[in-house]
Amino acid sequence: MQTADTKDKTKLSTGAAEHTPLMKQFFAAKSDYPDLLLFFRMGDFYELFYDDARKAARLLDITLTQRGSSGGAPIPMAGVPVHAYEGYLARLVALGESVAICEQIGDPALAKGLVERKVVRIVTPGTVTDEALLDERRDTLLMAISRSKQGYGLAWADLAGGRFLVNEVDSVDALEAEIARLEPAELLVPDEDNWPEFLRGRVGVRRRPPWLFDADSGRRQLLAFFKLHDLSGFGIDDKPCATAAAGALLGYVEETQKQRLPHLTSIAMEVASEAISMNAATRRHLELDTRVDGDTRNTLLGVLDSTVTPMGGRLLRRWLHRPLRLREVLVQRHHAVGSLIDTGADTDVREAFRALGDLERILTRVALRSARPRDFSTLRDGLALLPKVRTILAPLDSPRLQTLYAELGEHDATAHLLISAVAEQPPLKFSDGGVIATGYDADLDELRRLSTNADQFLIDLEQRERASSGIATLKVGYNRVHGYYIEISKGQAEKAPLHYSRRQTLTNAERYITEELKSFEDKVLSARERSLSREKLLYEGLLDALGGELEGLKRCASALSELDVLAGFAERAQALDWSQPELESAPCLHIERGRHPVVEAVRDQPFEPNDLDLHPDRRMLVITGPNMGGKSTYMRQNALIVLLAHIGSYVPASRAVIGPIDRILTRIGAGDDLARGQSTFMVEMAETSYILHHATPQSLVLMDEIGRGTSTYDGLALADAVARHLAHTNRCYTLFATHYFELTALADASHAGGGSGIANVHLDAVEHGERLVFMHAVKDGPANRSFGLQVAALAGLPKAAVQQARRRLAELEQRGGDSHAAEMAPAALDAPQQFGLFTAPSSAAQEALQALDPDELTPKQALEALYRLKALL
């Protein structure tokens, strides 16, 4: 975690006069940004010195060299070429580093001494807006956290997209869940002790002075930035902790960006109750966009993302990580998807969007006045598509699609301006010229004609000079260093006319200048400079004109993003045979022929669909069956179906009826991460504890193999207690997979006591010769075998080891009897202290009792035996 008082080890020595003028200039710039890497412009390179050079050489794998000495010591140096610096900058930002760009702001050719330099830009992981430094399908967020006795305030901004939001949470667990959801690239926290463990060592965490996180100063900063008298319109007037975080974030942005931020026009308060809650473990276990091994392939997002545009892809990721509980919003999304499917409009929309660029981020660069020439042409082409998109949407009867139709707006004037002003194929860089279209400005056209006519003049001059000099190989050319020249080979140089003045000597040629060519050069170069100057003026005018339309254009880009996501949902529904879910107000979770969307997509064989039926009288399924039989897949698929329904997507099932859901909570062992130094069992218990404390009757809980990380009896006792707590206290919807067959007795106890709605289901397997065939079908009732030894054989365990295990199993079964729950007395749910699940260990009293034959005892002998037995207890 980077601290606020970290200082660069490079210091001006007491003998500062010993340093060279260049190093004095470097130290002056570096002293203002001690915690940042300083890219110091020197000609065609950005150089780094001293500790910056050592660090950059290590991180970027570039050469560490030295540049003479200064202050009596060698100067460590490393550098990157200016023309390729963005690639190196992107790598540093991805590693959590921040960089200050120090440019030459004077003209080296005109400078009498040292050229003037100034830090003109600061690039940090959370504030980048350059296209080359961004992941086009993922938000790049800057977050600030403040804390109080009541909890934590969060503020986060997507500077590249123009979004600014806040929230408040009341616990460390909720804070960790929000950070897992948002995945900020950079995180600002007060420089204080006792921050949660999960923040320590996290890449991109910046400690800032605590006084920057003050609620009152934050409020004043927000009012000044948005030019308001109060914050009630944003809904954060009574959120001091969130306001403090927002003020700290805004201060950091203004400090690093060194310019106005006109694209941040409001701040929104996220309401936690509007979304389904998922903690960090649940997101990890369900592999929404990243697998537990860190791979991003074969995830739910990978299957679901059929968006055409980058901005649509980012919106889909946000939806996926924040499934909504707002039934009206979701029903409108489902209806919109259905309308697109029924009319075939999804195909038309997606085809039109193939010519649509990332308007959201382009508009940010327009607002920040950093837009490049091709940003203008992309925006122009995007606005030109609007009439076609509006024509597609106009006849559709979906309320949500009609809202999007209205939000698209009509931007004919802006489109016409860009069509007339921007060249059809503008260059990558403005300095190359040719950005403004011919015919847009008469003065610019005249200046360009001078440059164009210059080419013909040079052709004519070359022919005349060849004729007058008699040198057939004479050439007229130009380079940026020496300007225009007449070139004659070494062998012909003696024939050069007397009025030729030598300009440059090469190995095989001599270059000359004449008064006529010099006069022409002055005229042409002046025209080109004036042309670029005029073009820059027109370019700035376009930025001004677009700045006045930003609000409407941002709404348009937002509507296009949502339309892209909805059309993608429609495409996926048809391609994958998904159906529209039904969201009910009554409690239920009924899924017919459900499938796991990711497993089905990657399997070569047909996926075996399964049903799920949960309701107030049937809230828990105890799931048994062999390892590899599909228990975890079955649990996850139902959670993913619920999640998909709550982002507005169709779902992989023939029918899904879903009542209110407030949380999805999971404990699945495949997600164990020991990086924090906790044992597997400790992780298991911590995640289980979170679930038991947070699950409600509207929560969906997945529990996979609880108790496996400890001894058999401890594990069984814990699994039993957890199952009882979920069924009896939390009363949530629970899918409880276990290898403890004894737990299947809970269903019998539930029925006997009219209790908490527990039922048994199982997944079966069939032995076919030496092969084991997993059926993957969920059936009612408990499993009768675990097939553990068969699975071990499938995994490649040596035959001798498997045979030894079979012999040992036979011995254990003979000694202890079959401990299957069907042969055991069920434990009543209303008496959680009575397990009634274990085969009791033998004792002296038990052995003595077994030795008695009641039919052979007299009354006196029976009484004496009873006393003996009592004494043994």
Curated annotation (Swiss-Prot):
GO terms for biological process: mismatch repair. InterPro entries: DNA_mismatch_repair_MutS, DNA_mismatch_repair_MutS-lik_N, DNA_mismatch_repair_MutS/MSH, DNA_mismatch_repair_MutS_C, DNA_mismatch_repair_MutS_clamp, DNA_mismatch_repair_MutS_core, DNA_mismatch_repair_MutS_N, DNA_mismatch_repair_MutS_sf. Keywords: ATP-binding, DNA damage, DNA repair, DNA-binding, Nucleotide-binding. It holds the Pfam family MutS_III. GO terms for molecular function: ATP binding; ATP-dependent DNA damage sensor activity; damaged DNA binding; mismatched DNA binding. SUPFAM superfamilies: DNA repair protein MutS, domain I, DNA repair protein MutS, domain II, DNA repair protein MutS, domain III, P-loop containing nucleoside triphosphate hydrolases. PROSITE patterns: DNA_MISMATCH_REPAIR_2. ATP binds at residues 625-632. GO terms for cellular component: cytosol. It comes from the Bacteria. Coiled coil: none annotated. PANTHER family: DNA MISMATCH REPAIR PROTEIN MSH1, MITOCHONDRIAL, DNA MISMATCH REPAIR PROTEIN MUTS FAMILY MEMBER. Belongs to the DNA mismatch repair MutS family. NCBIfam families: mutS1, PRK05399.1. HAMAP family: MutS. This protein is involved in the repair of mismatches in DNA. It is possible that it carries out the mismatch recognition step. This protein has a weak ATPase activity. This is DNA mismatch repair protein MutS. It comes from Xanthomonas campestris pv. campestris (strain 8004). The lineage of its organism: Bacteria, Pseudomonadati, Pseudomonadota, Gammaproteobacteria, Lysobacterales. The gene is mutS.
